[in-house]
């Protein structure tokens, strides 16, 4: 039986790792790195674009793109799943869909799985072993209340010592009911750590002991995904779970990276806007960055 690490031990491990290894996004080279997803008018991913198809604005001012990459880059992901009481009837559907995501990870990708209810658990260290991740997925336990924001926040914590592209993939079928922190704190934390959040929300029905209740995913998840450059998917049936988890894997392997040198390192939060020259194409990227030399990307 796999032993799941307690929150206290996880926090200690994260702090130790962070002290030993600084993430790429804390290097002092003056490049703002912006992972970007491009879709067409039908929502399909657009591959094989070149640098001249993009433009980027910093506080509304066009910037010269000084770094561009259109090759698949490895990512590190925390897959955090709602295993609260409202999901009891749908847990097997969720596990199978999550397996589809894990099976599509490339050898250089790393991940861990976790679950939240009235407690939060993680599978251990990040690994590229998909079989280990699938085995860990089967051992996650379910509970009752929904600690959504606590779970996402702690997932971001797990990514602190990680270099490169950092992802939280969160799934829920309802509102947060039990967290100690709120949405605003989680958003600030994700921005600070430059973590992309992908969120999948499912509308579902469950029996609360007295009557059938229809749950709705927390509406703030959409804003969290939009602000961090991830994606938000709201589903009406469990049949959509598999294709949606597969779509997220495809997106993560189809990201472009755009970089520019900021004109002023004023330590302030700046607004970012990535635009496409083809009118039928849409770019999705994080909305802000902090113009501080200590918080910009190292492209070496």
Walk through the language-model features, giving the residues of each.
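Scaffold/interface architecture of coatomer-like assemblies
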Residues: 18-300
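Bacterial N-terminal signal peptides
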Residues: 5-16
């Amino acid at each position: 039986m796999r032993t799941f690490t307690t929150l206290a031990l996880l926090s200690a491990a994260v702090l130790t790792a962070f002290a030993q290894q600084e993430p790429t996004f804390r290097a002092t080279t003056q490049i703002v790195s912006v992972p970007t997803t491009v879709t067409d008018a039908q929502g399909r991913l657009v591959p094989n674009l070149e640098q001249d198809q993009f433009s980027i604005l910093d506080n509304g001012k066009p910037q010269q793109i000084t770094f561009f990459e259109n090759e698949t880059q490895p990512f590190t992901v925390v897959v955090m799943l709602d295993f609260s009481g409202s999901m009891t009837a749908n847990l097997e559907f969720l596990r199978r869909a999550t397996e589809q995501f894990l099976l599509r990870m490339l050898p250089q990708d790393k991940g861990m799985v976790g679950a939240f209810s009235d407690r939060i658990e993680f599978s251990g260290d990040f690994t590229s072993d998909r079989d280990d991740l699938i085995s860990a997925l089967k051992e996650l336990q379910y509970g009752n209340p929904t600690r959504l924001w606590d779970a996402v926040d702690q997932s971001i914590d797990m990514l602190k010592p990680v270099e490169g592209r950092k992802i939280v993939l969160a799934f829920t079928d309802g509102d947060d009911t039990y967290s100690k922190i709120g949405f605003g704190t989680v958003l600030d934390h994700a921005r600070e750590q430059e973590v992309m959040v992908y969120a999948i929300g499912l509308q579902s029905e469950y029996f609360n002991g007295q009557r059938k209740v229809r749950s709705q995913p927390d509406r703030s998840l959409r804003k969290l995904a939009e602000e961090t450059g991830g994606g938000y998917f709201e589903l009406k049936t469990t049949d959509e779970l598999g294709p949606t988890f597969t779509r997220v894997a495809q997106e993560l392997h189809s990201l472009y990276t755009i970089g520019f040198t900021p004109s002023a390192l004023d330590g302030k939060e700046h607004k970012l806007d990535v635009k496409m020259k083809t009118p039928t194409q849409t770019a999705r990227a994080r909305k802000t960055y902090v113009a501080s030399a200590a918080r910009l990307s190292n492209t070496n």
